[in-house]
Amino acid sequence: MTRVRFAPSPTGILHVGGVRTALFNYFLAKSTGGQFILRIEDTDQARLVPGAVDSIKESLQWLGVSWDEFVIQSERLETYKKISDELIAKGHAKSEDGAVRFITPTTGKTSWTDAVGDKEISFENKDIEDFIILKKDGYPTYHLANVVDDHFMQITHVIRGEDWIPSCPKHILLYKALSWEPPIFAHVPNVLGTDGKKLSKRRGAKAVLEYKSEGILSIACFTSPTTGI
C-alpha cells in the first residue's frame, strides 16, 4: 500500500509552496488507494509559533485535504533516543557535549534514483560532514526524526522540494546504518516568488488562509499556475 506524509513544521503559516507539496502527496495516496499522514515536525522548539498547528489543519481542511493519521514528533522523543543509542552501540554515532553526532563514512558514494526524472543522484561520502542527530535538549534533528518516522510509519514515497536533495544522502546513510530499506524519493521543483527565489515563511510568503479570507475559492489553489498543479 502507498503511504505518504506531509510533514510541515509549526513555525509559521502554510503557504502555497507547502500546499503544493501536500497536494502531490495527497493525490498520490488517493489515486493509488493509499494513505496520507499529516505529521507535525515540531522538534525545533525555539521556533514554534502558537496556533500554527491549528492553522495548518484549517488550511488543509479548506482545501478538502483529509488525513488518515495524525502524528506529532515531540510526542516520540523516547523513540528517537532509543535509535540514537542503537547507532552509538553500532559505532555509527558518538556522544559529543551532550549531543549525538552521526559518523559519516569517508570513502565511497551515496546514491539514489530520484523518481522525478528517473535520474541518479550521487554524493561523495568524503564531502558529507558528520552531523548532529540528537541535540543537547533531547530533541532529534530533522535528519534523525525524518528517517525514524518514515521507517516506523512505513512511508513508501517521500515527496518533497528539491531543496532537500543535499540532505537526502544523510538520510540514506542513516537507513543503511540501521539496516532499513529507504523509501522512494521524489524531489519536486520549488515554487518560486516573483523574485525568482523559493517561497518561504521567513521571506513573507502569503498564508493560504489569507486567500480564504479574501473570498477566493479553494479550487483556485489546484489550478493556479503558481502551484503548477
Where are each of the predicted segments found?
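Short, histidine-centered active-site or binding-site loop motifs used for metal coordination
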Residues: F6-P10, I40-D42, V148, F152, ...
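Glycine-centered secondary-structure boundary/capping sites
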Residues: W62-G64, Q154, S179, G215, ...
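Active-site cores that bind ATP or allylic diphosphates and position pyrophosphate for catalysis
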Residues: I72-Q73, E86-K201, A207-Y211
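Short, surface-exposed, charged/polar-biased interaction segments
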Residues: L77, K81, L192-D195, L217-A220
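Short acidic (Asp/Glu) and glycine-rich catalytic loops that position anionic groups and cofactors
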Residues: L63-G64, H151-Q154, L199-G204, A220-T226
